[in-house]
Amino acid sequence: MEFLTHSLLPLHEVCALQQRLSAPNLPWRDGRLTAGDQAALVKKNYQLDPNAELSLAISNCISTALTSDPLVKSFSLVRKVHSLLVSRSSAGESYGWHVDNPFSRNGRRDLSFTCFLSDEDSYEGGSLMIQTGGEDTKEFRLPPGQVVLYPSSTLHCVTPVLSGDRYVCVGWIESYVKAADDRSMLFNIDAGARGLLARHGRSDELDLIFQSYTNAVRRLSS
């Protein structure tokens, strides 16, 4: 399983963030300032100053939600959430095909995530497209408060916004397990074992599965 979409933030928190994002005179900066040389050529959006009070509040809210969510923790084996950015894309703005840098000064980038903050009917366009292999792509345009996680090694883009304003928070996860295939395998084992536990209760055989899962994480961790 390469991608995870999940309801991360409750509606009341999203509504409060939306109200604050609509305030005038927020310190928006050219999004190219945080892109690598190649990505900057295809990036056209704006990002909230990372040191602004609202940016820090949104980053802390989403980081806390990610690191405390059982499904996200199982999927990503999160060691660290870092380098969060609040992004705004208006009509005519987009982010062309690119791959994220493998690391930043804050940590390795094993998984990327986008948490959607705008109501779906408040803007047109602005889909996140992720290449899944060859010419196949997956499209993500999620309700506010939902997040998509995906390997940072994938090519992805944001299609042009046709109208309205698209607000998202993006960031990266350094995982205990670097390889996406290994994380996917471990996630499936964990999900299967927990499903058996919920349906049939504890057993000696299930203990062996959990033991093997734990030792596999230990062996594959970096």
From Swiss-Prot:
Is Iron there in the keyword field? yes
Q: What is its EC number?
A: 1.14.11.-
What keywords sit in the KW lines?
Dioxygenase, Iron, Metal-binding, Oxidoreductase, Vitamin C
In terms of Gene3D superfamilies, this protein maps to: q2cbj1_9rhob like domain
What's a Pfam family in this record?
Answer: 2OG-FeII_Oxy_3
Broad enzyme group: oxidoreductase
Can you tell me which residues bind 2-oxoglutarate?
166
* GO MF, any single term: iron ion binding
Q: List residues traversing the bilayer.
A: none
**Can you quote the record's cofactor note?**
Binds 1 Fe(2+) ion per subunit.
The UniProt record gives the binding positions of Fe cation as 98, 100, 156
User: SUPFAM superfamilies attached here?
Assistant: Clavaminate synthase-like
> Which cofactor does the UniProt annotation name?
Fe(2+); L-ascorbate
Fe2OG dioxygenase domain mapped to chain residues: 80-175
Gene Ontology biological process terms, A to Z: DNA damage response; intracellular iron ion homeostasis
Record InterPro entries:
Oxoglu/Fe-dep_dioxygenase_dom, PKHD_hydroxylase, Pro_4_hyd_alph, Pro_4_hyd_alph_FE2OG_OXY
Q: What is this protein called?
A: PKHD-type hydroxylase Syncc9605_1577
